[in-house]
Design a protein with these regions (language model features):
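Extracellularly exposed regions in secreted/surface proteins, prominently low-complexity, repeat-rich
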Residues: 141-191
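C-terminal motif of bacterial Sec signal peptides marking the signal peptidase cleavage site
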Residues: 24-27
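Mature extracytoplasmic domains of secretory-pathway proteins
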Residues: 73-150
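Bacterial N-terminal signal peptides that target proteins for export
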Residues: 2-15
Length: 191
């Protein structure tokens, strides 16, 4: 059988293509999970004076939760209510964080928070909180940056990270998706 010089090149080329294809496929088999700071890049920013809760109720709440001021971020305001996101340390690992959402309703002189008990889970990136008094109630949601939501009456996007339920008789849920196509659902608390 006759040997041609290009046959050696073809063998090398086929091997190279096979190796590169395997490396390329290995890179596509799974993408790393999003982190809390990817979903909430506000935590990569330096804290400012605006990040300090402005009423005693929310300051006390942050202190009770043992959250250092450097881990609290103001994320929006709507109708006299301020919203804050906080990062706390996980009970299970120093490398993991729990995400909390604080509502400081000045008009009703009440504050409340919602925290996950488990480390941040990118498949469940939304936090919901509701505070109320005899004077009224506020229900809101903390959502990741760049979330795309459907529009619906009774739901108001107060900032990049905050959606407020403005009408308690609005549809019961609002759906959306994150840039990586993770679907999210905001569900109204009833009762």
């Amino acid at each position: 059988m006759r040997h041609y010089p290009f046959q050696d090149f073809l063998k090398f080329g086929i091997t190279t293509v096979t190796v590169l294809s395997a490396v390329g496929l290995a890179g596509c088999t799974g993408s790393p999970e999003r982190t809390v700071t990817e979903d909430y890049p506000i935590f990569d920013q330096q804290a400012t004076d605006q990040d300090v809760p402005s009423i005693a109720h929310s300051q006390d709440l942050a202190a009770d939760m043992e959250l250092p001021a450097k881990d609290v971020r103001w994320v929006g305001q709507h109708d006299g209510t301020d919203f804050y996101a906080t990062l706390g340390e996980s009970q299970t690992s120093d490398d993991d964080h729990v995400l909390c959402f604080i509502i400081a309703a000045h008009e009703f002189e009440v504050a409340g928070a919602s925290c996950s008990s488990d480390p941040y889970d990118p498949s469940d990136p939304v936090r919901q909180a509701r505070v109320g008094s005899t004077a009224g109630a506020v229900q809101a949601f903390l959502i990741p940056a760049n979330a795309q939501l459907e529009q619906a009456d009774g739901w108001y996007r107060a900032s990049e990270h905050v959606v407020v339920l403005t009408d308690p008789s609005a549809q019961s849920e609002l759906t959306g998706r994150l840039p990586d196509h993770t679907e999210i659902t905001l569900q109204r608390i009833t009762g």
